[in-house]
């Protein structure tokens, strides 16, 4: 919130109509989904005159869709926000329902292929994609360690030993609790790389508490009982356009850098 945001942009506030002058003026910095949803809720309350400033030439932020060209077979691709589920994102789902943004089930799974090992998360046929893993003791031990690692969420999220969990890194925890290199290299590190596009060194240096909290919230510690992931029909640009349509004309000002 600001009364005088930036240089020449003060004119945007001075040009409010008579009805807006009776409302409290609010400036939202950034037209990503957080800024747009905040502006939408403020506008819906009918108590605020909202102006949104975005330094980029377009609104959306992390929700960025690269549209297909005219070539046959090409698809629109989301570069940032891609999927959500009905369990972890109740507020986002509520926003979609209010704006009548359509969504559909996504085909999403996890799989690993290394020089000697392959496995995936889609049922037993995926886990044992390589039949030789049925008699591979290292692979079976990895399954046991996945189940063991799943239980750490109860300790991390219980609130006990708060300082311990906040200081402990992923690498330290794995070493101190006897997890195998096979489990680390064929489960934990590939999962981190898939989610955050990070290298092994960075992943092992992650603080354990936020990592486990994120995995637990997204049901990534489960092997079979994972949520159904969904995607916005028409990609993320569709919900950005829906929010913009629900806001007053001209209240979102792109290409305006706030100092």
Which residues fall in each region the model found?
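N-terminal Rossmann-like FAD-binding beta1-loop-alpha1 element of flavoenzymes
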Residues: 21-52
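Conserved donor sugar-nucleotide recognition element shared by glycan-biosynthetic enzymes
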Residues: 62, 208, 232, 236
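N-terminal glycine-rich dinucleotide-binding loop that anchors FAD/FMN and/or NAD(P) in oxidoreductases
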Residues: 65-92
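Helical element adjacent to the flavin cofactor pocket in flavoenzyme catalytic cores
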Residues: 213-259
